[in-house]
């Protein structure tokens, strides 16, 4: 016996007699068998090697429109800039190319463009490291051409999150305003190039949604949000505020957006669907367009030609207004894309629209809008890659199933299903896709037509894994009811019939891998058990020697000899949500609860193996998979709802 690591427990124990390694998760022993060919030379003290390959972020799927605003702009480079998770995305629609600013370490909440149209400010939320150390909220100022970070503001100053940021527009843009999410929603003004705070003041007890400098008067700022609009004057290092007076007009629950017209008018949109015009320099309403939208006015954009565009929430309309506030043109955004969140001006009469369903659309009020960026709307867990094409499927809590092309970065199709989805798996032919949901229902879909082939129910709990055997003869369905249901499969995945169920786990099924020859499969469960099964009989295989030297078609189980090096010291067994082995058997990628994707060498069987580590996701990373040819890895986010595509380099 030799043990490794002088932690509180012996973290890993190697037994030569049994040919096994035992690791401990939360004090629970997890025994793992060493294949005969590795056993004679195996030692816990061998240093693990870093993988020779790395990951480079190539594409980000998604946009954060659900709960953020004023976060979509066109740059002179022809790129639109927006954010999702902790990534600021610069997307050249013409060249179908993305660049990424990766300076943030947690969710980005706001974005502003400097008048020079090159410098960008982004603000982020407070985060925590894997070790539980706080990561303070702050603003990063960066160059959109070189992607280099120029300045970092407010470390230790902001509380909870930075929710609004804006550059001054007239005096060379040398000031930056920011609002945080502390109880007092502190408004601060910074000389950003010197990284010094000029002044700060309590803004409001209520939510603040917008903070912006006046375009021509560098001493005036406007903030608005829940039941308020304030006009601020910056003088001699202090800020004084005047409240916007609604007088005879109904005071809205929320003032949602603000923009400035050439003559100096300030225009606001509110939750009551009204546009209010505040005369130049004043805090009184000089003109009102009541009921401009049915439901809230979420976005306003003043166009170069002096007209104004507004975007509606409930009514999903984009409306063009003349300089006298008469309606010139309107168009409705299709329901699937969701309510309008923000509107940005493009070249010519092109507009870009961000929606609350995390999509970005391109078009005009004359022609209507088409999809540019498709997003998921809620937590994502299901991910599977096509066995022979550059395609992958994602599905999640939002009941959406998308089949994507990793080349065109667009969905080939999307389908809404009845239940929130949790898992997905392709038949080896690639023509049928299984999708598991949280209710115990699971479906078979035709990947070409996206028609429903079949629908089945096993138990009434979440289906955490659906996996076809490599020979296509079986389908294993792992459930939170601790059982694996086994089906025989005919007609290329179109016909399935239940063979039986595998009972033996004392906790829910988390992961499942098939043997290369389809003769057995292995499962992991919520209490860190590893069990082996014969699909033909649905019986547990209890002989260690029967499975010790088995070649596995995949490595998605987070517990097993080939992968146990992914676990860090003192890890909780729920810290790692998913692993995936590259098809050439050389790489292993893991997805963890700390927003990180790790890349290891495979096999990964030395304790605490070395890895390359990548950020981009901002909450738990829920799944990971390699494309069929190993050219790319894909990862899905939980709360951040994003899908990241990484080139293997």
From Swiss-Prot:
- Tell me where in or outside the cell this protein is found: Cytoplasm, Cytoskeleton; Cytoplasm, Cytoskeleton, Spindle
Q: Which Gene Ontology MF annotations are present?
A: microtubule binding; tubulin binding
Recorded GO cellular component terms are:
cytoplasm; microtubule; microtubule associated complex; spindle
Q: Where are the WD repeats?
A: 56-93, 97-144, 151-192, 195-234, 241-280, 285-323, 369-406, 410-447, 452-489, 495-535, 564-602, 609-648
- SMART domains (UniProt xref): WD40 (SM00320)
| Keyword annotations | Coiled coil, Cytoplasm, Cytoskeleton, Microtubule, Repeat, WD repeat
Q: In which tissues is it expressed?
A: Ubiquitous.
Chief subcellular location:
cytoplasm
Q: Domain of life of the organism in this record?
A: Eukaryota
The answer on whether this UniProt entry bears the keyword Phosphoprotein reads no
What mutagenesis or variant effect is reported for residue 484 to L? In a colorectal cancer sample; somatic mutation
Q: SUPFAM superfamilies from the entry?
A: Quinoprotein alcohol dehydrogenase-like, WD40 repeat-like
Ligase as a keyword? no
Q: Any one Gene Ontology biological process term?
A: sensory perception of sound
Sequence segments annotated as region (Tandem atypical propeller in EMLs): 10-649
Record note on quaternary structure: Interacts with GRID2 and may also interact with GRID1. Interacts with EML3. Binds unpolymerized tubulins via its WD repeat region.
Entries under PANTHER family matching the protein: ECHINODERM MICROTUBULE-ASSOCIATED PROTEIN-LIKE 2, WD-40 REPEAT PROTEIN
What is the recorded function of this protein according to its Swiss-Prot or TrEMBL entry? Tubulin binding protein that inhibits microtubule nucleation and growth, resulting in shorter microtubules.
The UniProt entry's sequence similarity note says: Belongs to the WD repeat EMAP family.
User: Which comment does the entry carry about domains?
Assistant: Contains a tandem atypical propeller in EMLs (TAPE) domain. The N-terminal beta-propeller is formed by canonical WD repeats; in contrast, the second beta-propeller contains one blade that is formed by discontinuous parts of the polypeptide chain.
- The entry's protein name is Echinoderm microtubule-associated protein-like 2
Classification from the root reads: Eukaryota, Metazoa, Chordata, Craniata, Vertebrata
Q: Which gene encodes it?
A: EML2
């Amino acid at each position: 016996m030799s043990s490794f690591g002088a932690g509180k427990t012996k973290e890993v124990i190697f037994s030569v007699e049994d040919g096994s390694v035992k690791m401990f998760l939360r004090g629970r022993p997890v025994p793992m068998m060493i294949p005969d060919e590795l056993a004679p030379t195996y030692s816990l003290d061998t240093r693990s090697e870093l993988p020779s390959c790395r990951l480079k972020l190539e594409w980000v799927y998604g946009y954060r429109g659900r709960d953020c605003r004023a976060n979509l702009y066109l740059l002179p480079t022809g790129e639109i800039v927006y954010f999702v998770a902790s990534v600021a995305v610069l997307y050249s629609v013409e060249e179908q190319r993305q660049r990424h600013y990766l300076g943030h370490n947690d969710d980005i909440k706001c974005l502003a463009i400097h008048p020079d149209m090159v410098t960008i400010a982004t603000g982020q939320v407070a985060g925590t490291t894997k070790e539980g150390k706080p990561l303070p909220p702050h603003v990063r100022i960066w160059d959109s051409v070189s992607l280099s970070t120029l300045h970092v503001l407010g470390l230790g100053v902001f509380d909870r999150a930075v929710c609004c940021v804006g550059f001054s527009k007239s005096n060379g843009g040398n000031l930056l305003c920011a609002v945080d999410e502390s109880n007092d929603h502190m408004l601060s003004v910074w000389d950003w190039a010197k990284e010094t705070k000029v002044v700060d003041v309590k803004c409001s007890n209520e939510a603040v949604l917008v903070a912006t400098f006046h375009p021509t008067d560098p001493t005036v700022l406007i903030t608005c949000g829940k039941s308020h609009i304030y006009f601020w004057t910056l003088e001699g290092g202090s800020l004084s505020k005047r409240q916007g007076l609604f007088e005879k007009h109904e005071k809205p629950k929320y003032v949602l957006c603000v923009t400035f017209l050439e003559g100096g008018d300030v225009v606001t949109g509110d939750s009551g669907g009204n546009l209010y015009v505040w005369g130049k320099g004043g805090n009184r309403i000089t003109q009102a367009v009541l009921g401009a939208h049915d439901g809230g006015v979420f976005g306003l954009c003043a166009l170069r030609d002096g007209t104004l565009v507004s975007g509606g929430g409930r009514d999903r309309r984009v409306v063009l207004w003349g300089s006298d506030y008469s309606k010139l043109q309107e168009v409705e955004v299709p329901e699937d894309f969701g309510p309008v969140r923000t509107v940005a001006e493009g070249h010519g009469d092109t507009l870009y629209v961000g929606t609350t369903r995390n999509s970005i659309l391109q078009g005009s009020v004359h022609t209507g809008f088409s999809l540019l960026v498709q997003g998921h709307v809620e937590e994502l867990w299901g991910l599977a890659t096509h066995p022979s094409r550059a395609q992958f499927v994602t599905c999640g809590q939002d009941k959406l199933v998308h089949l994507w092309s990793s080349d065109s970065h667009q969905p080939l199709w999307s389908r809404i299903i009845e239940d929130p989805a949790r898992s997905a798996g392709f038949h080896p032919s690639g023509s049928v896709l299984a999708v598991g949901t949280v209710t115990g229902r699971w479906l078979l879909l035709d990947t070409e037509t996206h028609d429903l082939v079949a629908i089945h129910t096993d138990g009434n709990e979440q289906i955490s894994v659906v996996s076809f055997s490599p020979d296509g003869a079986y389908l294993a369905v792992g459930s939170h009811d601790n059982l694996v249901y086994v089906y025989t499969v005919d007609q290329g995945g179109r016909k399935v019939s239940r063979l039986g169920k595998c009972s033996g786990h004392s906790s829910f099924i988390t992961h499942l891998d098939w043997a290369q020859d389809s003769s057995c499969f292995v499962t992991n469960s919520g209490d860190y058990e590893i069990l082996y099964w014969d699909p033909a009989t649905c019986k547990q295989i209890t002989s260690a020697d029967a499975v010790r030297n088995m070649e596995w078609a995949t490595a998605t189980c987070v517990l097993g000899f080939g992968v146990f090096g992914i676990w860090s010291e003192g890890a909780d067994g729920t810290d790692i949500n998913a692993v995936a082995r590259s098809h050439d058997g050389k790489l292993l990628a893991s997805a963890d609860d700390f927003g990180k994707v790790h890349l290891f060498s495979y096999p990964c069987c030395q304790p605490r193996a070395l890895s390359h580590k990548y950020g981009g996701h901002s909450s738990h990373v829920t799944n990971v998979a390699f494309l069929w040819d190993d050219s790319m890895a894909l990862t899905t986010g939980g709360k951040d709802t994003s899908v990241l595509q990484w080139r293997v380099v």
